């Protein structure tokens, strides 16, 4: 296969990987942790994945400790844990 063909194949595989929905079985385990504001008092707007409602929800993060189920934006939460705007897995 030519190098152009290999590049095209690599590009298509990359695009497919980006667009393939994340199923519930593929979510990182930390997506199932509860929201944890931590112990500090920084009052940072953050988002966590709520596995019961299948939505990314806002919470206030204190800035230290907590757990891995926290994201700086709703979009990053959706990308990582697979929640959609309507709360269904994407």
From Swiss-Prot:
GO terms for molecular function: serine-type endopeptidase inhibitor activity. InterPro entries: Kunitz_BPTI (IPR002223), Kunitz_BPTI_sf (IPR036880), Prtase_inh_Kunz-CS (IPR020901), TFPI/VKTCI-like (IPR050098). The keyword Signal applies. Residues 1-24 form the signal peptide. Expressed by the venom gland. The record marks 41-42 as: Reactive bond for chymotrypsin. Serine protease inhibitor. PANTHER family: KUNITZ-TYPE PROTEASE INHIBITOR-RELATED, SERINE PEPTIDASE INHIBITOR, KUNITZ TYPE, 3. Belongs to the venom Kunitz-type family. This is Kunitz-type serine protease inhibitor B5. It comes from Daboia siamensis (Eastern Russel's viper).
């Amino acid at each position: 296969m030519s190098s152009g063909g290999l590049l095209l194949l690599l590009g298509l595989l990359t695009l497919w990987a980006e667009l393939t929905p994340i199923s519930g079985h593929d979510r990182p385990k930390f997506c199932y942790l509860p929201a944890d504001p931590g112990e500090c008092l920084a009052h940072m707007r953050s988002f966590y994945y709520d596995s019961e409602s299948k939505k990314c929800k806002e919470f206030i993060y204190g800035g230290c400790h907590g757990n891995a189920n926290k994201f700086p934006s709703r979009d990053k939460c959706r990308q990582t844990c697979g929640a959609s705007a309507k709360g269904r897995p994407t």
